[in-house]
Amino acid sequence: MIFGSRRRIRGRRGRSGPMTRGLSALSRAVAVAWRRSLQLRVVALTLGLSLAVILALGFVLTSQVTNRVLDIKVRAAIDQIERARTTVSGIVNGEETRSLDSSLQLARNTLTSKTDPASGAGLAGAFDAVLMVPGDGPRAASTAGPVDQVPNALRGFVKAGQAAYQYATVQTEGFSGPALIIGTPTLSRVANLELYLIFPLASEQATITLVRGTMATGGLVLLVLLAGIALLVSRQVVVPVRSASRIAERFAEGHLSERMPVRGEDDMARLAVSFNDMAESLSRQIAQLEEFGNLQRRFTSDVSHELRTPLTTVRMAADLIYDHSADLDPTLRRSTELMVSELDRFETLLNDLLEISRHDAGVAELSVEAVDLRTTVNNALGNVGHLAEEAGIELLVDLPAEQVIAEVDARRVERILRNLIANAIDHAEHKPVRIRMAADEDTVAVTVRDYGVGLRPGEEKLVFSRFWRSDPSRVRRSGGTGLGLAISVEDARLHQGRLEAWGEPGEGACFRLTLPLVRGHKVTTSPLPMKPIPQPVLQPVAQPNPQPMPPEYKERQRPREHAEWSG
């Protein structure tokens, strides 16, 4: 029995589960609609307040009507029982030859016959009469009519010589339901004769029910009308607000010619005028900023192109002098080396400015091919590895054992990695720099982690700004121009990828490049975490398959590097 009871309990829980979930979902949907819809809140509050007022008024009016109907009934019943008492006294005091029971029955029949509408009697309506003489000692009580329907409390008042009335539910041969029972003692030769009249309240109850139904129907119709009125009134406010919201969204999307329609001279019209004035002012400012931006980009592009021709001439002359520097005295030889070095930096700056101008103008294009990104990482390490060797910084490389094929512009991705590794070397403080790669089904990520000075709060975004430097006094070992990370983040966006930064003061920094494996796909997640998991960082064996930079990287270095990377 216990087990059966448990099974039944589990069954009830199982059946109530979907209903509970459905109610929960419905409540959440209603809550969302309540928060998001001003019109719904206005209509609901209007209906709620109107319902409260209608209920209060309905209760008051129903009470007033009920009391009025019953008061009329009571007054008519009092008049009726006064006449009935006179009639009973005349019959009982008439012939002495009749027995008491016969006299009581005759009086009852006479009273009930007067309720016939054709006789013009019965002002309070139809009624039934009860006559009773209580028993005294051995003498039994004499009654006429349904004496058992008279409440004992009412009989107590009448025995005390008082006229009284009471509402009660009765069941007689001709009527069953609520009734008004009124009683009074009579003045006759028969001592303690009591007279009671039972007035059914069927007609009064029907009248009150009709009034209540009419008021309920009227209240329901009034609620519907109020809901429609509230809906129309709130619509006059909500529609312009929604229109302003839609126009503001389109304005934010770049449709600067969008304006709100102005109708009339009310508050909404003034709101539309103010909104249009604001939109016009913003449009002018945006147009001015676009014009200034175009002028700036055109100036940068023109200056870069104009400087390239004389720079090429100077470069040829400098290379010629540098090739014969062995024939010069030491002072001139040193000057020649400095000139060539600064020309390298100047040429890199011009290349970066041209690249930035192409990104700003929106003409930068990808030369996509399917490549193994491990090779791209190795090429980047080969170009900047000598910087780590000169600074005494160990490069720890962790690459997958399998190929990582991605559809990318290998030149741009390699430039991103060169910039990230060179930037890490500049800020590593003679501590190792770790390069990791991982891939999943859709994306590939490369992180470059250093354990140097790190980044202060808020610098994760500033680090990608043009010419921004966290510490202007720090010397760049890589000789960068300050545009490398700005170009890198644009190259990442061109691939529909992400370039992100994290850092803490004294803990170092981590830059993460995430790219889609297939061109056109968007990056939603990254296979590598941004914030590194705490672990020993000074030991190369702390990561699986860590390895220093291979020796062949050193053989690939040239005396003078003309790569496109910058710090």
Curated annotation (Swiss-Prot):
Extent of Basic residues compositional bias: 1-15
Region Disordered, residue ranges: 1-20, 526-567
Compartment(s) where it occurs, according to its Swiss-Prot or TrEMBL record: Cell membrane
Record membrane topology: Multi-pass membrane protein
Residue ranges of domain HAMP in the record: 235-287
SMART domains associated with the record: HAMP, HATPase_c, HisKA
Signal peptide: none
Cofactor binding note of this UniProt entry: Autophosphorylates in the presence of Mg(2+) and/or Ca(2+), but only Mg(2+) ions promote phosphotransfer to MtrA.
Alphabetical list of CDD domains matching this protein: HAMP, HATPase, HisKA
GO molecular-function terms, A-Z: ATP binding; phosphorelay sensor kinase activity
Alphabetical UniProt keywords: ATP-binding, Cell membrane, Kinase, Membrane, Nucleotide-binding, Phosphoprotein, Transferase, Transmembrane, Transmembrane helix, Two-component regulatory system
GO cellular component labels: plasma membrane
List of residues that carry Phosphohistidine: 305
Keyword Cell membrane: yes
Record's catalysed reaction(s): ATP + protein L-histidine = ADP + protein N-phospho-L-histidine
Keyword Metal-binding attached: no
PROSITE patterns membership: HAMP (PS50885), HIS_KIN (PS50109)
Main location group: membrane
Enzyme Commission numbers on file: 2.7.13.3
Skewed-composition ranges (Pro residues): 529-551
Requisite cofactors: Mg(2+); Ca(2+)
Described purpose of this protein according to its UniProt entry: Member of the two-component regulatory system MtrA/MtrB. Probably functions as a membrane-associated protein kinase that phosphorylates MtrA in response to environmental signals. Probably plays a role in cell division.
PANTHER family in UniProt: HYBRID SIGNAL TRANSDUCTION HISTIDINE KINASE C (PTHR43547:SF2), TWO-COMPONENT HISTIDINE KINASE (PTHR43547)
Protein name per UniProt: Sensor histidine kinase MtrB
Species this chain originates from: Mycobacterium tuberculosis (strain CDC 1551 / Oshkosh)
Gene assigned in the entry: mtrB
